Amino acid sequence: VHTRRPLIIAAAVATAAFTLTGCVPNAGSGEAAALTVDSGADSCAVSADTAASGPITFTVTNSGDQVTEFYVLAENKLSIVGEVENIAPGASRDLTLVAQPGEYFTVCKPGMVGAGIGTTPFTVTGESVEANADDAEAEDAAVASYTAYVKSQAAELLPQVQEFVDAYVAGEDAEAKRLFPLARVSYERIEPTAEQFGDLDPSIDYRKPGAEAEGLPFTGFHRIEMDLWLDAAAENYPDEKIVALTPAERATLGEQLVTDITSLYDLVHSDDFTLSLSDITNGAIGLLDEIAAPDGKLPGEENEFAHTDLYDFTANVEGAQVAYEAVRDIAAAKGDEGAELTKTLDTQFAAMLELLATYGDYEGGFVDYSTVDQNARNELGAQLNALSEPLSQLTHTVLGVSAA
């Protein structure tokens, strides 16, 4: 995180009906296929793992003992194409969507926190379904889809940060170091949204120079990072006396991070939380700006002690891709310009993620970024530029205005 951004709260969200196309089906597209979902305490059973393209209604019954949610995810397991939430124990709710052919996943989230359970492949067969091009309806669907994604990532973030903080406070430094980059992934995917909330983001994710430049307490992820990698901190700041925090100081620092992440979760799940279409498009652009900034991931300054920048780099790209995909169909419908832009962005996002995958992955780990030489960083930068340049046109194409 580099600079403060103003609070942006706009437009409306949240419907129970989504489409996989981002558009609303024409009337007369046929009766909806009827599937049932049993969301239990430790299971998520869908009555079928395939359906024909067209309208589908999932009737979700909560047989567990916590309020639950049900999601239909895109093939990347990140983009949310449909979700129904706040299903009380014993209650049922319907999710109706229009399914285009493709591969998807279904998942339940008892307690509405964490990564969810029972993630299962779901295949839609048949021909593409015609959808109308009503701009307002398509925009509402895009905003609702991306808002659901933000909420989902915040829900995954909270237990990840708690696990990381627990290890850190317990003095389990090796485990805390392993968890540090993983605990940041969901945050980095939705960083522009987090930055909307005034002082919350600086408390969570400011680097040491940024906090000091603004006269703010140095807290959050990067303060813990500095304490875990003391040798690197001493090397980076040779004129300062860098000492290990006491157990009590660790506890206070960890508690503050969990409190801040809990506040973020509460804010994005509140009835007052809304996003606009421009929040989505400019957020996608902003995520790539975060990577390329002088104190960002590409130059290796974001995680200056841990050198785990490739985790953040990948998460920023993934978050930008999800934001782009939320508005992709709207952009593609904007004449030849939109069709060409989406074709280019599809190609460049795939190329960027393919290049990043040569350095590792979340499960097996990414290479230490300090071992990535300048030629390799230049290659990453060139591909980032090849993606960033067309992405910078997204707001103009979707809304007919320049990016903020």
Where are these regions (language model features)?
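Bacterial N-terminal signal peptides that target proteins for export
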Residues: 1-10
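C-terminal motif of bacterial Sec signal peptides marking the signal peptidase cleavage site
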Residues: 19-22
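Bacterial signal peptide processing site
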Residues: 24-26
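N-terminal edge beta-strand
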Residues: 30-52
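Beta-strand cores of secreted/periplasmic/IMS beta-sandwich domains, seen most often
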Residues: 47-66, 93-107
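Beta-strand signatures of extracellular beta-sandwich domains
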Residues: 69-73
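Extracellular/periplasmic metallocenter environments
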Residues: 88-131
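Mature extracytoplasmic or organellar-lumen-exposed domains after removal of signal/transit peptides
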Residues: 128-404
